[in-house]
Structures are given as structure tokens and as C-alpha cells.
Amino acid sequence: MSKVIGIDLGTTNSCVSVFERGESKVIPNKEGKNTTPSVVAFTDKGEILVGDVAKRQAVTNPEKTIYSIKRIMGLMSNEKNAEEAKARLPYHVVDRNGACAVEIAGKVYTPQEISAKILIKLKEDAEAYLGESVTDAVITVPAYFNDSQRKATKEAGTIAGLNVLRIINEPTAAALAYGLDKKEAEKILVYDLGGGTFDVTVLETGDNIVEVLATGGNAFLGGDDFDNKIIDWLVSEFKNETGIDLKGDIMALQRLKEAAENAKKELSSAQETEINLPFITADATGPKHLVKKLTRAKFEGMIDSLVGETITKINEVIKDAGLSKSDIKEVVMVGGSTRVPLVQEEVKKAFGKELNKSVNPDEVVAIGAAIQGAVIKGDVKDVLLLDVTPLSLGIETLGGVMTKIIEKGTTIPTKKSQVFSTAEDNQNAVTIMVLQGEREFARDNKSLGNFNLEGIPAAPRGVPQIEVEFDIDANGILTVSAKDKATGKAQNITISGSSGLSEDEINSMVKDAELHKEEDKKRKDAVEARNQADALVHQTEKSMSELGEKVPAEDRSNIEAALNDLKEVLKDENSSKEQIDAKVEALSKASHKLAEAMYKKDENAGANGGNKKDDDVIDAEVE
């Protein structure tokens, strides 16, 4: 039976894990690291780079290097967070069928397609490590991701060639990894602050049960926002000193982002750091350099309100769970941004107790996802995972009111229905507007989609009975149906979310990903062939030089001709493996005479060595 991989598809970094021989372990990538930067780059040569290699060239290729794609996953173009993303990100965020996408060199890519490229790398790294093909996966999402974002994540997995067995919440996965071996029931709080998202979840673990009691968060709050505070400060300081606004310089902004991220990390252990960016820009007076000292106290002042938001959310979630802080036995810290000292101090102060930092914040979510995969496959027995829906779901009713059908915090999977009627006499159709959120009016909540139920028999208003049913699966993905109870006519919709991708489009993207895989393999094969050819050229030239006149003129001429042919092919960067191999074979054949000459040279050297008179040897007998 093929193995199931657990994937933490993060905003900043991603991680993949597998459950084998009774434990879940992180799979290192081909570069030997346990996490892979969630960065995808498109080069001028048509190459697609993923991970560390993509991140390294970001400064010189800012408009075609995509990072933090998770922040626009399932995001509508008219949402507030979309406007902020467009203003912040150096690459082009554009509208595609009402949803956010990115434009690179004139081509539009959905967040699902970009995320799929990250997933493909994780899949290939897992296959290289395990030595077998991998298809099945469990992928994690922030607990506060809405239906659109969950659906988009699952679509990314499909495009990457994965069979997504389950979408599970990141804090739940972390709790699964942390609490699986706990025998006694205990209530824990998982504080998960990553690169772009924040979740807080209260769970009860013990005796192989992990039950979510309440969850909350902010899908647009994380380490990126800490970085942005530093960037804004640097831009402001530099403008005050030089009069130059760096916000219009994409390459400078990319350098500022890298510097801000590094400064944030350094301030986790140091009280002060220096940000030194020579030649950040230039004006008529010459080049300009940016050199600033940033203290931990200054940085903490910048992010204090953001950290404060997370503490407020902790209080709300504990209240939703019907608990008090004294009921929480452990506070488990998850996500790379929990390394920031102020975060740890404020959470510790909120509970008045030491925090549990026993889990690796970058790896624990993927480890939990792999455990969930093993549960689904039956490799781990008797484990029950009870998750909840993070936001209420309902429909728009008369007066623009949101009528909730499934309340937030309901354990999933679940199915609930409610009967509604018409608002006007002789109304023969109704439009069902599906909403997600906690506000009283429809306009203030997120619209997930709509559909029509037609053919309702003419009747006075309030007489027809229309049953609306909401069905949430274990992935937290919603299907809505409406049925006229008098006629039995029904209509349903699986909410496709704001991704706007049809099944045909997803299938097309799957094929496109496969095509790129073939192209990448051809390119890799060509690189390997080129390296071998370069080595042959070097060796042949070296041998020709060493043998000199010992190579007959005709043979030398043939070898030089084949050598020049191979060099010409190598000059063309678009040469295929087959073209290079053909010229390598021709040079190898022509070089046979070289091998013969080298052999004769070695033979003669050996013979001369054997005939050397032993002038320094004295014959003697040893008693």
C-alpha cells in the first residue's frame, strides 16, 4: 500500500512528513533541509524554480518571484485584503473572474497553480526520500480559512497530481502530534502564529481522542506583517533622510523585505541589529546607502498592536469553549513567528504560566498531518479526530438578513436543514445566496456563491415550503441543496468558492503541470548531458596537449573537427540532450585513437622503468 504524506503548505515555508514504522517523521528536501521556502520563480530562460533556489534570486527578479501566495488563496479581488496584497507585493496581483491571481510575463496564474508548484516539489522530495511513487496526501490549512480558501487548497493538491485524502486544520494537526500519546484527558490551547496566518484553538486530548472545542483567528495576520512594520519604518526613515521614496522601487523593496526578515530573526536572540543595504538606490548626487540600527524595544513597539490582537482572540476562543484560562493545562506554541520574544512574553503573561515549546514550531503541523494520513489509511488505530467549523454558515433572507443554518464551532462532518418560503405571491423561483461569517446582515459576511431553484408552483407568499440543507464534509468543504417539498424539485451546489475554477480548468491545469514536469525533466537531462560533454571536452583537450605529435595528423584532424562540433552544440543553450549526446558519441569515436596513443605511452613508460639499471642496489646475503 502506498504511503500517505502529510503536508504543511505554509505562507513562508512548507514541510512534508510521512508515518512509517510507528512514528511520523519529517522528510528532508533534496537540499537536505526539513523545510522548503514557499517561493516560486519564473526565469527569463523559461525555467520554474521552487524553494531555496527561487528565494536566492528574488532580489534580481522581484516581479517574477512569487512568495506568500497563501495570502491571496481563495481571495476575491474586491476584498480589503486583496487591495493590501496588491499594494505590498512586488509581483502583479490581478483579477481573474472576480478572484485574485498573479500575472507573470503576460500570463495569468491562479494561486492554486502557484501553490501546486510548491506541492509538486514536496511530492518529488518525498518520492526521492521514500524511493517510491506518492499520490495520497493530507494537507493542512489555517483553522480560520473559509470555504473558498479550503477549496482552493484542495484544488492546488489536485493540480499537483495529489489525491487529497483530507484537508485538516493546522492547530488540530499540531494537537494530534502533541497529544496522541496522552493517556489522561487534558484541555490544551494551540497558539499558531505563522508567516501569514494566525489561529488559536482550544482542544481536549487524551485516550486517543482529539476534540476541538473552539477555534478562531485571522487569516491575514502573521510574520509577514511583522516584516512589513520594519519595511514601513525603513522606507519612512530613508525618505526623511534623503527625500527618496523607495516604495516605487520594486528591487529596493525586495531587498528591504529580505533585510526586514533577517532583522526580525536576529532580534529573537539579540537586543540590537544593524540593517546595512549599500547602493539601495541612486539620484543625481550619486548612489545612496541605507544603514540603520534597530533595537528589540523599537521592533516590539512596532508590532505591539498586532500581538495584542492575538491575545484578544485567545480570550474570545476560551470564552467560546465555555472555559476559563485556569482550565487550560498546556499552551502549545506553533508556527515560526512564535519565536519572537514579545509573542512568547505576552502569551505567557496572559496565562501566568510557562509555555509548552516542546514541539518544533516549523515541523509539528506536517507531523500531525502525516498521523492523520495514517489514521485514514488504518495504520494508526482507534484515533478519533473531532474538528469544528470556524465560521457560521447560512443564507440571505428577507431584508438582507443572514440566517444561520450551521453555527460556528459545530463538529464536522455535519448536515443541517431549515425550511424557508417565498417572499412574494406567485413567486416561481428563489435565489439561494450562501454566506459565511458572524455578522447579522448578508452584506457584511463573505458570499460563497449562489444558485436558483426554479419551477415553484404559483401560490400565495409564505405557502411554498423550500428546504435548504447544508452539508459540510470532513475537509470543511460545503455542499448546499434546496428542495421544493411540494414538487420534489431540487437543486444543489458544491461551493466552488471564489477560486472560480471549473472542473475543466482544473483538469487543464493538471495536464499543464504534467507538461511542465516533462519539460523540467528534459531540461534536467540536457543539463546533465551538457556537464558530461564539458568534462569530455576538457579531457580530450588535455590529452591532445599531453600527447602532442604522438597523435597522427589525420586522427588529430578528425578529433579536432568532432571537438569543434561538440563545442558549437554546447554554445547553444537550447540544445537538447539528444543533440548533445550525438556529438559526444562522435567525439568519443574519433577519440579512440587518443586512447590507443595514451596506452602506448603508458606501456613505453612501464617498459623503460623495467629496463632501468639498478646502480644503487648492493647485492648481499643476510644472515
UniProtKB/Swiss-Prot annotation:
Q: What is this protein called?
A: Chaperone protein DnaK
Pfam families attached to this UniProt entry: HSP70
What CDD domains does this protein map onto? ASKHA_NBD_HSP70_DnaK-like (cd10234)
- Keyword match DNA-binding: no
Keyword Phosphoprotein annotated: yes
User: PROSITE patterns this protein is in?
Assistant: HSP70_1, HSP70_2, HSP70_3
Task: Identify the stretch(es) annotated as Disordered.
Answer: 600-623
The UniProt induction remark is: By stress conditions e.g. heat shock.
Q: What are the protein's UniProt keywords?
A: ATP-binding, Chaperone, Nucleotide-binding, Phosphoprotein, Stress response
Task: List where the protein spans the membrane.
Answer: none
Kindly list the positions at which Phosphothreonine occurs in this protein.
197
Species of origin: Campylobacter concisus (strain 13826)
- Positions of disulphide bridges: none
The entry's function note states: Acts as a chaperone.
UniProt similarity note: Belongs to the heat shock protein 70 family.
Q: Which GO terms describe its molecular function?
A: ATP binding; ATP-dependent protein folding chaperone; unfolded protein binding
